UniProtKB/Swiss-Prot annotation:
Lipidation residue positions, type S-palmitoyl cysteine: 625
Protein name stated in the entry: Envelope glycoprotein
Function: The surface protein (SU) attaches the virus to the host cell by binding to its receptor. This interaction triggers the refolding of the transmembrane protein (TM) and is thought to activate its fusogenic potential by unmasking its fusion peptide. Fusion occurs at the host cell plasma membrane. The transmembrane protein (TM) acts as a class I viral fusion protein. Under the current model, the protein has at least 3 conformational states: pre-fusion native state, pre-hairpin intermediate state, and post-fusion hairpin state. During viral and target cell membrane fusion, the coiled coil regions (heptad repeats) assume a trimer-of-hairpins structure, positioning the fusion peptide in close proximity to the C-terminal region of the ectodomain. The formation of this structure appears to drive apposition and subsequent fusion of viral and target cell membranes.
Gene Ontology annotations for the cellular component aspect, listed alphabetically: host cell plasma membrane; membrane; viral envelope; virion membrane
Motif (YXXL motif): 650-653
Lineage summary: Viruses, Riboviria, Pararnavirae, Artverviricota, Revtraviricetes
Keyword check for Membrane: yes
Length: 659
């Protein structure tokens, strides 16, 4: 709806900028429903429902299956009488599609039935009329996909898009109408019963062509008109569409996007139950107290997920290099990338079902930083071939429907991040995937880096602090001979694999939350999706920084880590370490260097008296010289004036006159 505040604005043409805004708004409104489906993980099985709608908009036929999107193209078999039910132009205007399945509908119009028997018209109310439908030829004309001139020539709904000959693209007519660009072919199906026993004895058989299988706009639907090649050319309109659904997430709260945001919950302090002293039993049967039921665990907030990443990184790092975790800071970056992939080798396995796949994400995350050397599948472009140590072909069969990566690895594909590959979706001539180990983008800083930054926040450092990522540290922490980088992550010792387990669990939780947030933002057309998608992690870290749970170092949110693990109140720990370091620094100062620290009022007093004292000293030093020069200058000027006055009163005589 467009609201106009002033009637005079009707005469003004809309500017090009306003037209662009209107087009963008309309594209968001009409494309919002499709956007959520187009960006799903193409390898994840979804519930696919092919539907056939009648001219009244009712769903008269549908077929469901759980398959990856755009891989299942069944034959559609709606019945003609189900399509014409409820139309005034046919003999069953009062029936629904389900009621038209009866052999003899109730409340029959015998006068109309007599005309059908006498004149041989088509209909669905009686067996003889339905038999004539089975014996009649038909042709089909599309509504969509035509040029503007073809649309004018073929007409609209009043002619069922078959206004002139040559508009038909499919059917069973004797001239066999065909088309190289249409999305479907329509023929006669095989009835399940005779027209005397059922009202549905005229099924159609709709099959998808190769252009139809490549078409990706089935979510909005496509419409055709079907007409019978008999007197009057009666017909009906039908629409085909695809519905892709998945189990909806459960959301509690007024805002589905930000309901789960917040800092990590405080761990409640559980008081220890005092152990009673042992005494001689008064009775042979001791009294057993039932333990209270464990409280239900709430879903993790954003703070819990981020802190879980840091804690998992500490466990993995402590397993490989314990000395590095004695006293350090692990920092999360405010800006992307939040994850990095390391290409890895390893054995892959085939599976006939997706039960072993970790379907948590929807393929919306793209890795911007992938390094290493690992296993590749498909046609890898030249820009990514340096990541491939070995490229293998994909074996697709009934027993090889899904390809699983090695232990807790992922597939980084051109279509997105996925835990499994569907062999029916993967196109070896166009698609490619790289087996990677996923590692969060966490920076490592020694303990002194943040202390120096907070002790002198305004001073300009001569050298930037050195940042090491978690992937580099894990590679460097493995013994020599095993390798670094991706090889360390795959072939590392047992303690590294144990340390990576908790990190992988934390990453799976965080990735699932990030992908769900993106899906919710796409569903909400009123939110600033692009801005929030870029700053969502930054907002989460801002919650932690403002709550004192982490310390800020430029664009990073840092957690203090020692051998006991990551500290939740890192800002308080930083202040304690700064105070301790300041006290140690004051103890090492000499007696004259600590004056200002011992007497705070001395700084104010000296700064107030220093200015006047320096000015007075300057006057006493330079004042006599300035005064002497000034007096000498005045005397010279006065003498010059006197000489001029004397010359003006007296005249000089020549020597001859004097003689």
């Amino acid at each position: 709806m467009l609201l106009i505040s002033n009637p005079r604005h009707l005469g003004h043409p809309m500017s090009p900028g306003n037209w662009k805004r209107l087009i963008i708004l309309l594209s968001c409104v009409f494309g919002g429903a499709e956007m959520n489906q187009q960006h799903n993980n193409p390898h994840q099985p979804m519930t696919l429902t092919w539907q056939v709608l009648s001219q009244t908009g009712s769903v008269v036929w549908e077929k469901k299956a759980v398959e990856p999107p755009w891989t299942w193209w069944p034959s559609l078999e709606p019945d003609v009488c189900a399509l014409v039910a409820g139309l005034e132009s046919w003999d069953i205007p009062e029936l629904t599609a389900s009621a038209s399945q009866q052999a003899r509908p109730p409340d029959s119009n015998y006068e109309h039935a007599y005309n059908q028997i006498t004149w041989g018209t088509l209909g669905c109310s009686y067996p003889r009329a339905r038999t004539r439908i089975a014996r009649s030829q038909f042709y089909v004309c599309p509504r969509d996909g035509r040029s503007l001139s073809e649309a004018r020539r073929c007409g609209g709904l009043e002619s069922l898009y078959c206004k002139e000959w040559g508009c038909e693209t499919a059917g069973t007519a004797y001239w066999q109408p065909r088309s190289s660009w249409d999305l479907i072919t329509v023929g006669q199906g095989h009835p399940t019963g005779t027209c005397e026993r059922t009202g549905w004895c005229n099924p159609l058989k709709i099959e998808f062509t190769e252009p139809g299988k490549r078409f990706r706009n089935w979510l909005q639907g496509r419409t055709w008109g079907l007409r019978f090649y008999v007197t009057g050319h009666p017909g009906v309109q039908l629409t085909i569409r695809l519905v892709i659904t998945s189990p909806p997430p459960v959301v509690v709260g007024p805002d589905p996007v930000l309901a789960e945001q917040g800092p990590p919950r405080k761990i409640p302090f559980l008081p220890r139950v005092p152990v009673p002293t042992l005494s001689p039993p008064a009775s042979p049967i001791p009294t057993v107290q039932a333990s209270p039921p464990a409280p239900s665990t709430p879903s993790p907030t954003t703070g819990d997920r981020l802190f879980g990443l840091v804690q998992g990184a500490f466990l993995a790092l402590n397993a490989t290099n314990p000395e590095a975790t004695e006293s350090c800071w692990l920092c999360l970056a405010l800006g992307p990338p939040y994850y990095e992939g390391i290409a890895t080798p390893g054995q892959v396995t085939y599976a006939s079902t997706d039960s072993q796949c970790r379907w948590g994400g929807k393929g919306k995350l793209t890795l911007t930083e992938v390094s290493g050397l690992g296993l590749c599948i498909g046609k890898v472009p030249p820009t990514h071939q340096h990541l491939c140590n070995l490229t293998i072909p994909l074996n697709a069969s009934h027993t090889h429907k899904y390809l699983l990566p090695s232990n807790r690895s992922w597939w980084a594909c051109n279509s997105g991040l996925t835990p499994c590959l569907s062999t029916s979706v993967f196109n070896q001539s166009n698609d490619f995937c790289i087996q990677i180990q996923l590692v969060p983008r966490i920076y490592y800083h020694p303990d002194g880096t943040l202390l120096q930054a907070y002790e002198s926040p305004h001073s300009r450092n001569k050298r930037e602090p050195v940042s090491l990522t978690l992937a580099v540290l894990l590679g460097l922490g493995v013994a020599a001979g095993i390798g670094t980088g991706s090889t360390a992550l795959i072939k590392g010792p047992i303690d590294l694999q144990q340390g990576l387990t908790s990190l992988q669990i934390a990453m799976d939780t965080d990735l699932r939350a990030l992908q769900d947030s993106i899906s919710k933002l796409e569903d909400s057309l009123t939110s600033l999706s692009e801005v929030v998608l870029q700053n969502r992690r930054g907002l989460d870290l801002l919650f932690l920084k403002e709550g004192g749970l982490c310390a800020a170092l430029k664009e990073e949110c840092c957690f203090y880590v020692d051998h006991s693990g990551a500290v939740r109140d890192s800002m308080r720990r930083l202040k304690e370490r700064l105070d301790k370091r300041q006290l140690e620094h004051q103890k090492n100062l000499s007696w004259y260097e600590g004056w200002f620290n011992r007497s705070p009022w001395l700084t104010t007093l000296l700064s107030a008296l220093a200015g006047p004292l320096l000015l007075l000293l300057l006057l006493l030093t330079l004042g006599p010289c300035v005064i002497n020069k000034l007096v000498q200058f005045i005397n010279d000027r006065v003498s010059a004036v006197r000489i001029l006055v004397l010359r003006h009163k007296y005249q000089t005589l020549d020597n001859e006159d004097n003689l």
